[in-house]
UniProtKB/Swiss-Prot annotation:
Its main location: membrane. InterPro entries: AAA+_ATPase, ABC_SmlMolc_Importer, ABC_transporter-like_ATP-bd, ABC_transporter-like_CS, Mo/tungstate-bd_C_term_dom, P-loop_NTPase, PotA_ATP-bd, Transp-assoc_OB_typ2. This is Spermidine/putrescine import ATP-binding protein PotA. It is a peripheral membrane protein. GO terms for cellular component: ATP-binding cassette (ABC) transporter complex. It comes from the Bacteria. The gene is potA. The lineage of its organism: Bacteria, Bacillati, Bacillota, Bacilli, Lactobacillales.
């Protein structure tokens, strides 16, 4: 039996001549934490609104529990939304904000009392029922918005950048709370953000969006370690992306040298892009590593130094090191074959997955 609760099949959305969603195909399973991740204008919030019923799609189908819901009004869908600005009613106290939807459903006073108390307990706001919204911190207001959304017991909770208005420390605290809440509730969360660190920390699965298309989907580890294209490699974390050629399976050439790698399934001498993450580079004395770079600048980031250098071919290198380097000095860089990730130019996610299965199965 399938546990897919939401599915988008060949979904497109146009505003006049502008195509904002292009052939979107995604499957969302019950009880998991999903994230739509991408820059502004990538289409992630449009997908959220299409699932919620706040807009009509131009092409394709939106399915809920296997049934087409394109024509089902928003108030009849088994989803609820937490908005970026929380959309709380300032003239109502905490209890009445959370109870608002229950009253629209004409529930009894006793049922409303019980459900509101349970929802506030779930978000750790016991004792706040009589507080005015203006008396609450940003984090507390966000919890009220979540309580109002979950009190109606939706099967899917949609969250549209709910942490964006919070300061850095509170955002991190709320990440833990959101993840814990999702696990306690056991319902599906679909979270929208442009913050890749948030997405990596929270998600069971991420859909990376750009220009109205899903560039890649997968677990945070898969997407970080195996980006399918230049956009994903550059957008998720920080990367050194260098032009090269795939000499043969498990051997790649860049910077005028050949290196063993863990990739295969490409044409001999095919042009490729090589990805090396800054944290995978170790600094050695000059001429004792695999690449020499001249240190240009460095910044202290608290638990590491962020060092920028340039090789003889003027490629920029970003290095994360626990030890500082001296501006202007030449150092060596070393890395393991498994640290090298080779990307074909313009390879689709489908072709990437097929190639990966072929050579990993050998």
């Amino acid at each position: 039996m399938s546990n897919i609760i939401v599915e988008l099949k060949h979904v497109g959305k146009r505003y006049g001549d502008t195509q904002v969603l292009k052939d979107i195909n995604i499957e969302i399973e019950q009880g998991k934490f999903y994230t739509l991740l991408g820059p502004s204008g990538s289409g992630k919030t449009t997908i959220l609104r299409a699932i919620a019923g706040f807009l009509d799609v131009s092409e394709g189908e939106v399915l809920f529990d296997g049934k087409r819901i394109n024509d089902v009004p928003a108030n009849q869908r088994k989803v609820n939304t937490v908005f970026q600005d929380y959309a709380l009613f300032p003239h109502l106290n905490v209890f009445d904000n959370v109870a608002f939807g229950l009253r629209l459903h004409r529930m009894s006073k006793q049922d409303i009392q019980t459900k509101v108390e349970d929802a506030l307990k779930m978000v750790r706001l016991q004792g706040y029922a009589d507080r005015e919204i203006s008396e609450l911190s940003g984090g507390q207001q966000q919890r009220v918005a979540i309580a109002r959304a979950i009190v109606l017991e939706p099967q899917v909770l949609l969250l549209d950048e709910p942490l964006s208005a919070l300061d850095a420390k509170l955002r991190k605290d709320m990440q833990y709370e959101l993840r814990e809440l999702q696990e306690r509730l056991g319902i599906t969360f679909l979270f929208v953000t442009h913050d890749q660190e948030e997405a990596l920390a929270l998600s069971d699965e991420i859909f990376v969006m750009n220009d109205g298309e899903v560039q890649q989907s997968g677990t945070p580890v898969d997407i970080y370690d195996e980006p399918v294209n230049h956009f994903v490699a550059d957008f998720i974390g920080e990367s050194n992306i260098i032009q090269g050629h795939m000499i043969k399976d498990f051997l790649v050439e860049f910077n005028g040298k050949r290196f063993e790698c863990a990739d295969a399934g490409m044409r001999p001498n095919e042009p490729v892009e090589v990805v090396l993450r800054p944290e995978d580079l170790d600094i050695t004395p000059a001429n004792s590593g695999k690449v020499n770079v001249e240190v240009d600048t460095q910044l202290f980031r608290g638990d590491y130094y962020e060092i920028v250098g340039y090789d003889d071919l003027k490629n920029e290198w970003l290095i994360h090191s626990t030890n500082p380097a001296k501006d202007g000095e030449t150092v060596g860089l070393t890395f393991d074959p498994e640290d090298i990730h080779v990307m074909r130019l313009n390879e689709s996610e489908e072709d990437f997955d097929a190639r990966l299965e072929t050579y990993e199965g050998e």
